[in-house]
């Protein structure tokens, strides 16, 4: 069966205006007092590879209300999950629409037939997909899909859904949106592992158009795999005071080990030479990027786009991979590439792409 080739036409991006990275580091240091853990946190913060993280929470407000970063950090008791979802319901659609507006400056968005939204940091019904469709004035009959709670590879899953839609219906024009408000889930605990984990994450949104047009970046094949006996390494659960992240320190070593195994390399590369590809790797953290580089024996420059996005935005969960892909599309080094993200499972999802 001959299927239509699918293409990404452009990628729109948006982050909130509040840079809270240094605020968070100061707050986290206060939680630990003058302890050995504080010294270790400070050292690891400096080595994180992150310079900025953006939040829908205001950086500094005299009122220190629950919607300001300072107020959210210092509130006692910590804001409830319900309170955090109120902010998600208000702010997530706005950030998504800003990314779509950026996309509209690069690509014609008329005739949208499908909407696929990835979001793992909040829940609301009617869903954020319906809110976005209504705010954009899309047809009430538009076909919608919401990809939720999959974590950092949800953006790839959303692209995979769009890819299969266009392959089955070459006339389809699929708007894909990934929007995450990770900063809403500031931890209530003060342990080193909890505070270091939260230090990675920021807010962001990205949008792209997937269709069968002859131009753009072609989506060639998708793949996914789950590493055995790894389900406890990354967990994302709903708590009473936000969503709780468990991120084991074993993750980088497991990734590096898996990437050296023939089974995963065959799934990932499908016979291609890793050195001759562009690499859009989700920067889950500096050690994750380093693990992929070492596991695949890549030149350090190969993961420059991933490190650049990590430094300027932190880990924005599902939206991050689209930020990295946008960097590669703007300055490609090779004719083809691989996009990949790791998340709960421990699973890897990705796709091969090439220039049309």
Listing of model-derived features with the role each one plays in the protein:
Residues 140-141, 147, 154-161, 178-204:
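Active-site glycine-rich loop that binds ribose-phosphate moieties when present
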Residues 48-138, 149, 273-289:
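Conserved beta-ketoacyl condensing-enzyme motif
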Residues 2, 87, 120-121, 141, ...:
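Claisen-condensing/thiolase-fold acyl-transfer catalytic domains that form or cleave C-C bonds
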Residues 49-50, 91-106, 161, 205, ...:
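Short, well-ordered amphipathic alpha-helical segments that serve as non-catalytic structural scaffolds
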Residues 79-80, 110-114, 136-148, 188-193, ...:
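Glycine/charged-rich beta-loop-alpha catalytic/anionic-binding loops adjacent to active sites
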Residues 1-87, 173, 188-257, 261, ...:
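Condensing-enzyme catalytic core mediating Claisen C-C bond formation in acyl metabolism
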Residues 124-130, 176-196, 223-240, 286-294, ...:
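Active-site-adjacent elements of ketosynthase-type condensing enzymes
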